[in-house]
């Protein structure tokens, strides 16, 4: 049985969001095809994801100086404890499905906060004399991304930094398989928006059967 983290980073719902429409189709089909797997949905707009701030640095510093967790302030305990929960949950999963829009050439900031929470030395990667080495070598990941313009080819290609960033992070973590499913052009070609959406949903369902 595999454990799947279905990670969505969009404030709207599947009726309003092309990425969530494809993501919902993917995960529903996945559940039908992999009935023994456990799927955990993390809606990053609803989850408590602490930003790495002064309280977090202070708490980490105290722990590194051999102070007990109970010696941290209440706010330090809450933030450091939650960050630890998120990173442990991430490491325990077998598969990751990220669902995002493309906003200002990247993804919503809640996903960056989440990546910061799980990018932990000793858990998702380690430092060696040869440099950092990823530890998640038995995982696989997928990024479902909707983007209103055309970024797969043409002059805007270099401006797409959301999927490129996730590709770099998954590689840094050692994840050997990272796929992308893109729904694009619906804002540039509004007369074809419904067709583009339906095609994205179809491709998402197909991919779910073999992911």
Swiss-Prot record:
Keywords: Flavoprotein, FMN, NAD, Oxidoreductase. Gene3D superfamilies: 3.40.50.360. Coiled coil: none annotated. Its cofactor is FMN. It catalyses: 2 a quinone + NADH + H(+) = 2 a 1,4-benzosemiquinone + NAD(+); N,N-dimethyl-1,4-phenylenediamine + anthranilate + 2 NAD(+) = 2-(4-dimethylaminophenyl)diazenylbenzoate + 2 NADH + 2 H(+). FMN binds at residues 17-19. The keyword Hydrolase does not apply. Binds 1 FMN per subunit. InterPro entries: Flavodoxin_fold, Flavoprotein-like_sf, FMN-dep_NADH:Q_OxRdtase_AzoR1, NADH:quinone_OxRdtase_FMN_depd. Its EC number is 1.6.5.-, 1.7.1.17. It is an enzyme of class 1 (oxidoreductase). GO terms for molecular function: electron transfer activity; FMN binding; oxidoreductase activity, acting on NAD(P)H as acceptor; oxidoreductase activity, acting on NAD(P)H, quinone or similar compound as acceptor. Homodimer. Quinone reductase that provides resistance to thiol-specific stress caused by electrophilic quinones. Also exhibits azoreductase activity. Catalyzes the reductive cleavage of the azo bond in aromatic azo compounds to the corresponding amines. Belongs to the azoreductase type 1 family. This is FMN-dependent NADH:quinone oxidoreductase 3.
């Amino acid at each position: 049985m595999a454990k799947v983290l279905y990670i969505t980073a969009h404030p709207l719902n599947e009726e309003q969001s092309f990425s969530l429409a494809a993501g919902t189709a993917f995960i529903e089909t996945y559940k039908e095809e992999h009935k023994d797997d456990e799927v955990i949905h993390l809606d990053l707009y609803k989850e408590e994801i602490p930003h790495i701030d002064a309280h977090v640095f202070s708490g980490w510093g105290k722990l590194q100086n051999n102070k007990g967790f109970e010696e941290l302030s209440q706010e330090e305990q809450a933030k450091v404890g939650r960050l630890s929960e998120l990173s442990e949950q991430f490491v325990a999963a077998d598969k990751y499905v990220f669902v995002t829009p493309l906003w200002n050439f990247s993804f919503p900031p809640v996903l960056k906060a989440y990546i910061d929470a799980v990018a932990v030395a000793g858990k998702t990667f380690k430092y060696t004399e040869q440099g950092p080495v990823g530890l998640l070598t038995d995982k696989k990941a997928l990024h479902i991304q909707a983007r209103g313009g055309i970024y797969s080819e043409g002059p805007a290609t270099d401006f797409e930094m959301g999927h490129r960033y996730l590709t770099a992070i998954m590689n840094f973590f050692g994840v050997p398989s990272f796929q992308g499913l893109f729904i694009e052009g619906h804002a540039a070609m509004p007369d074809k928006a419904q067709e583009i959406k339906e095609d994205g949903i179809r491709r998402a369902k197909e991919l779910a059967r073999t992911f």
